[in-house]
Amino acid sequence: MARLPILLLLISLVYSTPSPQTSKKIGDDATLSCNRNNTNDYVVMSAWYKEPNSIILLAAKSDVLYFDNYTKDKISYDSPYDDLVTTITIKSLTARDAGTYVCAFFMTSPTNDTDKVDYEEYSTELIVNTDSESTIDIILSGSTHSPETSSEKPEDIDNLNCSSVFEIATPEPITDNVEDHTDTVTYTSDSINTVSASSGESTTDETPEPITDKEEDHTVTDTVSYTTVSTSSGIVTTKSTTDDADLYDTYNDNDTVPSTTVGCSTTSISNYKTKDFVEIFGITALIILSAVAIFCITYYIYNKRSRKYKTENKV
């Protein structure tokens, strides 16, 4: 007979009704509610807590008391007193809000004079989805170019006078507090495998010849830069003139330009503090008191001797 209660307990655990689940996303609001089965008794108090040991609120009549750093801004209690349903709303869900929430009813019979309180509780599981999906749209664009053929004969190509102009930008030297410079060099080549035909079409060889740098086609411009240095004694502006030829040489050489240093001096003025005056006053007062004490002692001794001398003369 002792095995029967154990068997019934195991059966109730196996076939118990699972807790309802609510699934929400991060940032959403979740509304949790539960109904009580005992509709005849009088509700004394209802409560909500989160497993394992976190009390959210206690509600009695029109008063709601929050615990464990929960506030009405985070969790609102939306149930009228002594209703069959108790409801809370969790706002702006985060990953920490996920878990099992339990509601409880504390009830008493209105016709019973005893202090017996019945208890019912129901649980619901809140799932907060933290997985986010993102879609990346990649658009690829391009064009194909098929080389055009020319009907020109090799001997005709050699007789043509062809020229091409190219514009190449050399790398910019790295400088501090100097305006950006771009050295533009124009090159002219008398021998290149590009032919201009009468029809406007062009034919390009697959392996063009290297382009040589010619010094006579360089275009040199002068650049004036201003460097402003702010110090505690004022603002110093330095004007410097730099031409692109010098910049080109600076880029190719490993020489560095020495920087200009602007120095300034700061004069510190010390003021006497209240503490210093107190110390001076204390020392002066001590000297005066010492002098007064010495005077009093001397006067006392002198007066005592005078009285003694007068007494001896009277006798």
Swiss-Prot record:
Location(s) in or outside the cell: Virion membrane; Host membrane
Gene3D superfamilies according to UniProt: Immunoglobulins
Disulfide links within the chain: C34-C103
TM helices/strands, residue ranges: 280-303
Keywords associated with the record: Disulfide bond, Early protein, Glycoprotein, Hemagglutinin, Host membrane, Immunoglobulin domain, Late protein, Membrane, Signal, Transmembrane, Transmembrane helix, Viral envelope protein, Virion
Intravirion topology ranges: 304-315
Record membrane topology: Single-pass type I membrane protein
Post-translational modification: Glycosylated; contains phosphate and sulfate-substituted glycans. O-glycosylation is required for hemagglutination and hemadsorption activities of infected cell membranes.
GO cellular component terms given for this protein: host cell membrane; membrane; viral envelope; virion membrane
Induction: Expressed in the early phase of the viral replicative cycle.
Record's subunit section: Heterodimerizes with OPG040. The heterodimer OPG185-OPG040 interacts with components of the entry fusion complex OPG143 and OPG094. Heterodimer with C3/VPC protein; disulfide-linked.
Protein name, as recorded: Protein OPG185
Gene: OPG185
